Amino acid sequence: MFGAGDEDDTDFLSPSGGAKLASLFGLDQATMGHGNEFFQYTAPKQPKKGQGTAAGNQTAPKPAPATTGTSSVLFATAVHAYRYINGQYAKQGKFGAAVLGNHTSREYRILLYISQQQPVTVATIHLNFELMVRPNNYSTFYDDQRQNWSIMFESEKAAVSFNKQVCVAKCNSISSLDAVLCQDLVAAEGPAVETGDSLEVAYTGWLLQNHVLGQVFDSTANKDKPLRLKLGSGKVVKGLEDGLLGMKKGGKRLIITPSACAAGSEGVIGWTQPTDSILVFEVEVRRVKFARDSGSDGHSVSSRDSAAPSPIPASDSLSADPVVTPLPLPLKPGEPGLRSKSNSLSEQLTVNSNPDTVKAKLISRMAKMGQPMLPILPPQLDSNDSETEDATVLRGAGQSLVTPSIQPSLQPAHPVLPQMASQAPQPSGSGLQTPSAALMQAVSLDSHSAVSGNAQNFQPYAGVQAYAYPQTPSVTSQLQPVRPLYPAPLSQAPHFQGSGDMMSFLMTEARQHNTEIRMAVNKVADKMDHLMTKVEELQKHSSGNSMLLPSMSVTMETSMIMSNIQRIIQENERLKQELLEKSSRIEEQNDKISDLIERNQRYVEQSNLMMEKRNNSLQTATENTQARILHAEQEKAKVTEELAAATAQVSHLQLKMTAHQKKETELQLQLTDNLKETDLLRGHVTRLQADLSELREASEQTQTKFKSEKQSRRQLELKVTSLEEELTDLRAEKTSLEKNLSERKKKSAQERCQAEAEMDEIRKSHQEELDRLRQLLKKARVSTDQAAAEQLTLAQAELQSQWEAKCEQLLASARDEHLQQYREVCAQRDAHQQKLALLQDECLALQAQIAAFTEQKEHMQRLEKTKSQAPAGRAAADPSEKVKKIMNQVFQSLRGEFELEESYDGGTILRTIMHTIKMVTLQLLNHQEEEEEEEEEEEEEKKPLRPSLEQPGPATPGMPPAPPSGETQEAPEVLPEQVVGETTPLPLQALPTPENGAQTRKGEPAEAEVPSEIKDSSLPPQPAGIPAHRVLGPPTSIPPKPPGPVTMDSESEEMLAADQRTVQPNGLLGEEHVREVATDGLLQGNSRRLSLTPDPEKGEPPALDPESQGGEAQPPECKQAEDVSSSGPRETLLDTELASAAAGTSLRHNQDSQHCSLSGDEEDELFKGATLKVPRPTAQPEEEDEDEVSMKGRPPPTPLFGDDDDDDDDDIGWLG
């Protein structure tokens, strides 16, 4: 309008309105190096659900024989497999897909299998192996038989892991990686990125270590936002940048870069410290900004696969010509036809470019202005306006409607101007000031303020429904919102998504047409607004001049209005013609486009038919060639296997031949050496034969001697068994005699107590008589004279002498009785000791003979070994009966040691002893069965069964003298060397400290016996002169308790207390305790504790008194009960010995009237067979009635023996 036709022509004929025809058919792909896509192989589409039934009955071919190396499973998952048969995919079922690999031989392959014994197909993975990733978790590949397989994974995670493992296997299949290796993990659609495009990616980088993904050296998972980069900027390492080329939005890819492509500075992303490492990146493209789209829109990042067209630029950028270069992609066969699209576009363009509609729009807009210039139009215009608006609304919904061309009459009825012009405010703005070219050039107004405001306020239409001119209510001169002229239909939006170059071309063409028409409409609207401002100015000027020339101004206004209206009408007609011409051009171009599309489809169908024919012929040819190749390969494999077997046999035979040659040379050398040795050995053999004849003679002589000695030895053994039986009988007699002696001692002690009681009664009566006589004497002295006093003194002296004589007679008779009993017991003991000494001498002689026999036997064994002609086996006599006999004897002897009527638990002791005897017999029998073939072992086994024949060790020579008053009384003790292994181990019998009735003289401490643990009670007696001493201690006085001992007055001469012993077995074998119970003293007021303290250096027996050598008494709190625990078999304390010791002590006190203990030959002979073994005592607290004295400065009691190991060894010494 107003001479702006050149601008319209240039706008419509600008380069943005045209496009290359070559881009329609993708002929410019040669410039990108892809070649003609129609003659390239395109992979078939993924199978649909109904395609697997067609080839369900066909059997899958047997896979090529896979190498059975030491391949390991790198990854395995379940897939749905499809095989490409006869132009479509046939479902084969659900298989297992595994990636197998052998890192040493660099052999990797994909295995599809039904089970472990049923492989389906094998595809070897090498550098040129291609695993093509498809949408919906599909992947396709060719196996070793060139069969196309498609597998569908159950999840995207499984597909990504499988594809990743295949890529790593491709990298591991070559020795050195020289180029970047890529593998798509997830398929994506859309244009590929190129150099210069901006990306937003998420990545994770690993080091390839030991053929697997190793340490993660970089990842965006640890960062707040993903990485943004521009390809070609050098922000990342070269290998990663090369691997990103060709990716699409939403795609994932695994990129393996060699060390040569991972070089860069330290700040570059993906750079690592080790320079020789292979880097592995997993990259996901999230957002893309293409460099070719940066000029057409102002957004930072645009998505090319979105359905909405690009927004419209602002008014100041209308003059720029956006050059859009669509990415040429091949038109795949099977795409829907585009004829309907082009028709709908052309119809929309023709309908929307109708000049009637444009004129109706303009008139409606002018009518809606604040001050309308034209007269009121008939009501027909409103209906046209509503019709056009309804039509545009329907077109926005995708319907193409043709509105009728309505030409309303624009002739003005009368030029009446409203009076509202003065009220229109001036629009404020800083727009461009352009003078009007049609009216007055001298007047310059701010006319473009409204236009620029409209242009600036213009916003991109939301979706595809409306191009909106947002209005501001405060500005009255602003244009009203207009319906969109050419909205893109919603139904066509899905066809613009990834449908190739034709779709992109049509989209850009439609956009260009829309922008050009919009620009033309905007220009017309701008010119109308400019005209309106001019008219307003003229109205202002005319209102000022109307005061002078009212008629003239009216005529001037009407003439000017008419001229302007005529110009407007002319311009509208011219614009109508231009629009008609352009719409005709667009229709012609649309017809051409549709013809070209139809022609293109025909060519594509023809090419597809030709390709199918070629494919069929190629498939038949390839099947034939594959059959031949398979046959040839099978033959080749057979031949190669035979050749390998033959070469292996040849090499094996050559190795055998060389080995045989070496053996031959070695054997020849050995033969020469052996010949020399045989010469030497022949001479040696002759000498040995002579020696052998001599040895045979000697062996015959020794055999005769051995037989005679064996017979004599058997006789001696019979004698020994008889002697042992006698010895056991003697021991039983000894025990019975000792019991009798103890009973007699008890009786004598009781008689003595009775005698003492009688003496006390006599003394009391005597004292009463004396008192009575003294009283009489006093009376007589008073009453009588000196003669009577003399008679009385004489009578008193006679009575006293008679009383003393009676007392002496009674004491002498009691002493005589005790001495007679004691002498009888000593005589019996001496007789038993003599018998035992004789038996010991005989046993020693027998042992010497046995030792001589064993030496002779060993000598004979050495002679037989030198001859190497020992007899094959001698029937060794079965010693089980002898062992049973010996063990029965042992048991009888043990049972004789105990009496079930006594207070100790005899049943428990018998059970433990029987258990030990059984264990010993089993050990002996097993030991004898292992070596029953050799007769020497029989002798060695019988030897430990006679421990009673061993010679006892020397004992202490005598009893030390009794210590003075206040010192500890030491008891003799047999040293550990004297303890001889006994025939049977006896358990420990715990006995408390006897509560003795103390005999107390004036100023002397009481003494009592101390029980000691006696070992080897069943042992043969010791030789004469080596006594085994009893342990004696000072007795402690106790208060009279029923049934306790009787205690006498302190002024009496002698006191005797009977031993009250309680046997308390505290457990089984090895867990018994000796408890010593302290007794409370009446006279001294405290209790004494007796402890055993050995002196191994001097050979003295241990002291049994808690007092120190200085004569000081130990405090009562230290006199506590001792628990003596034993770890091995223990001996019982004999009650008879304790009783006899008590009796002996009392007799010795009666005779000597002083402190002494049993010592000398009598006591030694009485207890010669008993050996004392007291283990380490452990202190046990006991309540005391008296005041406690501090034990500071006194050493603790020491154990009887220094070590218990010797005792344990002695206990089991009878086993050998």
UniProtKB/Swiss-Prot annotation:
The modification Phosphothreonine is found at T1093, T1198. Residues 196-289 form the PPIase FKBP-type domain. Residues 929-940, 1202-1216 have a biased composition (Acidic residues). Residues 41-68, 292-357, 927-1216 are annotated as: Disordered. The modification N6-acetyllysine is found at K91. The modification N-acetylmethionine is found at M1. Disulfide bonds: none annotated. It comes from the Eukaryota. Residues 340-356 have a biased composition (Polar residues). The keyword Cytoplasm applies. It holds the Pfam family FKBP_C. Involved in the transport of early endosomes at the level of transition between microfilament-based and microtubule-based movement. May be involved in the cytoskeletal organization of neuronal growth cones. Seems to be inactive as a PPIase. This is FK506-binding protein 15.
